[in-house]
A protein has these predicted regions:
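Short boundary motifs at domain starts and secondary-structure transition points
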Residues: 1-2, 88
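Short, basic and Ser/Thr-rich N-terminal targeting/leader segments
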Residues: 3, 32, 39, 172-174
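Short glycine-rich His-centered loop
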Residues: 4-32
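Active-site/binding-pocket entry motifs
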Residues: 15-16, 62, 196-197, 209-212
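Short aromatic-enriched loop/helix-cap "lid" or pocket-rim segments at secondary-structure transitions
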Residues: 19-22, 140, 193, 203
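Radical SAM [4Fe-4S] cluster-binding motif and immediate context
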Residues: 33, 201-222
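Glycine-rich beta-alpha loop elements in corrinoid/cobalamin-binding modules
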Residues: 37, 44-48, 53-197
Length: 222
């Protein structure tokens, strides 16, 4: 029996880790939304790809939860984020880490996550996607050598096909909606754009069972 392909999905926090205010987190709390982009993508993968195991690491949730429950902790948010990522990498041992980045203010956190993952295990494929990644793909590929691929526009169709490529060694040239680096020049290359999803009905229900959904209002607000 083939080994399951392990996929870890996470998102680049919108909060600046250097400016994270523990008092605000404790008294008022930060905005904390359940990561529907990650759960929807996970649902698509589980429906379309066989023999795959997915876990979600919502960094904002775990950071806010930790500081709510450990008021006297002197740990910095940036250090906690690194510890959370390393712990999950060591425990789950993913083959692929997908980083969702919806907003431009998360830009620096993409690099932080990618660097932590690759330093822990350089064989892991680190990919990113989302609104910001789509429009800043060149900047991302130019500035962070630890990002292997950028998914452009919606990944609900492209990401499952990419995982099939990794599992079954299908033709990389057949994949659409990706940006990567030329092996020689290192210049960004874009494949043909994947068609936009017009009919949303076939998109699976988000995989809410992969996150502690009921706890989100306890540690933040939305």
């Amino acid at each position: 029996m083939k080994k399951k392909l392990k996929v870890l999905l996470t998102s680049a926090p919108t909060i600046d880790m250097e400016a994270f205010d523990k008092n605000i987190n404790q008294i008022k709390g930060y905005v904390l939304y359940p990561p529907i982009s990650l759960t929807t993508l996970a649902g698509s993968v589980l429906k379309k790809v066989d023999n795959v195991q997915i876990e979600i690491l919502d960094l904002e949730f775990h950071i806010m939860k930790y500081f709510k429950e450990n008021q006297e902790s002197e740990l910095e948010a940036r250090v906690l984020m690194e510890k959370l990522i390393i712990s999950k990498i060591d425990e789950f041992k993913p083959d692929v880490v997908g980083i969702s980045v919806l907003f431009s203010r998360s830009h620096s956190n993409i690099f932080a996550i990618a660097n932590i993952v690759k330093e822990r295990n350089s064989s892991i494929q680190v990919v990113t996607g989302g609104n910001h990644a789509t429009f800043a793909y060149k900047k991302i590929l130019d500035e962070c050598s630890n990002i292997d691929l950028v998914f452009l526009y919606e990944g609900d169709e492209t990401f499952p096909k990419y995982l099939e490529y990794l599992k079954n060694n299908t033709k990389f040239e057949d994949l659409k909606g990706l940006a990567w680096r030329d092996k020689i020049t290192r210049a960004p290359i874009i494949s043909h754009h994947a068609p936009l999803i017009e009919n949303l009905d076939p998109i699976p229900i988000p995989a809410w069972d992969l996150i502690p959904l009921k706890e989100y209002q306890k540690y933040g607000y939305y």
